[in-house]
């Protein structure tokens, strides 16, 4: 059986590895800006000005990076 591609993990990993700054739009309307430092199935760790924020994925609406992210072709 073919392995399914997890676009979300690929996308977040590229943001993390390439240190791409992002604006994170939350479902309550707030915007957070920073770098993705880590992520798992339920959370994203965002760093802004040396401070970290752990954001639950269910509270995230959109990631808007400052530049396009290319996904690995596997």
UniProtKB/Swiss-Prot annotation:
Subunit record text: Homohexamer.
Alphabetic keyword roster: RNA-binding, Stress response
GO MF assignments: RNA binding
Residues annotated as domain Sm: 9-69
Protein name according to UniProt: RNA-binding protein Hfq
PANTHER family hit by this protein: RNA-BINDING PROTEIN HFQ
Family statement drawn from the similarity comment of this UniProt entry: Belongs to the Hfq family.
One GO BP: regulation of translation, ncRNA-mediated
Organism: Oceanobacillus iheyensis (strain DSM 14371 / CIP 107618 / JCM 11309 / KCTC 3954 / HTE831)
Listed InterPro entries: Hfq, LSM_dom_sf, Sm
Protein's job: RNA chaperone that binds small regulatory RNA (sRNAs) and mRNAs to facilitate mRNA translational regulation in response to envelope stress, environmental stress and changes in metabolite concentrations. Also binds with high specificity to tRNAs.
Signal peptide as annotated in the record: none
GO CC terms: cytosol
HAMAP family: Hfq
